[in-house]
Amino acid sequence: MATGQKLMRAVRVFEFGGPEVLKLRSDIAVPIPKDHQVLIKVHACGVNPVETYIRSGTYSRKPLLPYTPGSDVAGVIEAVGDNASAFKKGDRVFTSSTISGGYAEYALAADHTVYKLPEKLDFKQGAAIGIPYFTAYRALIHSACVKAGESVLVHGASGGVGLAACQIARAYGLKILGTAGTEEGQKIVLQNGAHEVFNHREVNYIDKIKKYVGEKGIDIIIEMLANVNLSKDLSLLSHGGRVIVVGSRGTIEINPRDTMAKESSIIGVTLFSSTKEEFQQYAAALQAGMEIGWLKPVIGSQYPLEKVAEAHENIIHGSGATGKMILLL
């Protein structure tokens, strides 16, 4: 470390494992932006389920150790590297990715992954945009190729990606059904675009959905927990319907015949398969949503950096989401 280089607090992971491997350090050097990079003073950072999978070492993408988790930061530009002329010190921004990690007081990001944060949204809301909204947009528009008038079922609709999917789907003219496991979660889902909501903790909730949609079935299902729901999803689909798998935490047995009569599809989605051009498309659509007002992130649990392990525990094992989980700095 260079003499006199500024230090910051940051969460570091030195080995893969449970939430206990998240270590808060106060001796981490503040990064210096290089060509096409910016340094952001972080005010808030979103916590996403994928970050727990990466931390555990079970995800397809394994960072080099040690590393700092976190992609979705919101804050203020602190410094700008060469050729990052779209930004200046003091700009309010949010990110869809970081280079140095977001669970920190400062984060380094490539300029093409940084976006202006409108004044009407606060930093907590800014930290809730990145992975949730970009993933929901990719799932609905890019992968499902939704058309106005189609129906969509959003499983786990009260979480960050779920609420984003509800807001986007409503803006694009879809009929939206959502599921949530708590009364508060169901209320939030209805407030954010869903036409009807079902309690997925009820044993017969699938039967209730079937009764509600009738023989036609559902055109699109946004699936957050495929290892639990995929087989049931196939029974709910319309002819030509598609299940978009956004999340899964294990394996499941399905009958491929269930896809044949309806000529239905199962499509997996991962945000980071998107090209740079696709990210720019998503950003343009979402920026319009912020300006018009249909994109309005709902904030759920909030934690200080010191309680990051608790946040990781609760995002997987909590009683039910009611908005986007964030870390406050």
From Swiss-Prot:
GO terms for cellular component: cytosol; extracellular exosome; mitochondrion. It is found in: Cytoplasm. The modification Phosphoserine is found at residue 248. It is an enzyme of class 1 (oxidoreductase). The modification N6-acetyllysine is found at residue 23. Keywords: Acetylation, Cytoplasm, NADP, Oxidoreductase, Phosphoprotein, RNA-binding. The modification N-acetylalanine is found at residue 2. Pfam families: ADH_N (PF08240), ADH_zinc_N (PF00107). GO terms for biological process: protein homotetramerization; visual perception; xenobiotic catabolic process. InterPro entries: ADH-like_C, ADH-like_N, GroES-like_sf, NAD(P)-bd_dom_sf, PKS_ER, Quin_OxRdtase/zeta-crystal_CS, Zinc-ADH_QOR/CCCR. Its EC number is 1.6.5.5. The keyword Acetylation applies. The modification N6-succinyllysine is found at residue 296. Gene3D superfamilies: Medium-chain alcohol dehydrogenases, catalytic domain, NAD(P)-binding Rossmann-like Domain. GO terms for molecular function: identical protein binding; mRNA 3'-UTR binding; NADPH binding; NADPH:quinone reductase activity; zinc ion binding. It catalyses: 2 a quinone + NADPH + H(+) = 2 a 1,4-benzosemiquinone + NADP(+). Only very low amounts in the lens. NADP(+) binds at residues 53, 158-161, 181, 200, 229, 246-249, 269-271. Its main location: cytoplasm. PROSITE patterns: QOR_ZETA_CRYSTAL. Does not have alcohol dehydrogenase activity. Binds NADP and acts through a one-electron transfer process. Orthoquinones, such as 1,2-naphthoquinone or 9,10-phenanthrenequinone, are the best substrates (in vitro). May act in the detoxification of xenobiotics. Interacts with (AU)-rich elements (ARE) in the 3'-UTR of target mRNA species. Enhances the stability of mRNA coding for BCL2. NADPH binding interferes with mRNA binding. Homotetramer. Belongs to the zinc-containing alcohol dehydrogenase family. Quinone oxidoreductase subfamily. This is Quinone oxidoreductase. The gene is CRYZ.
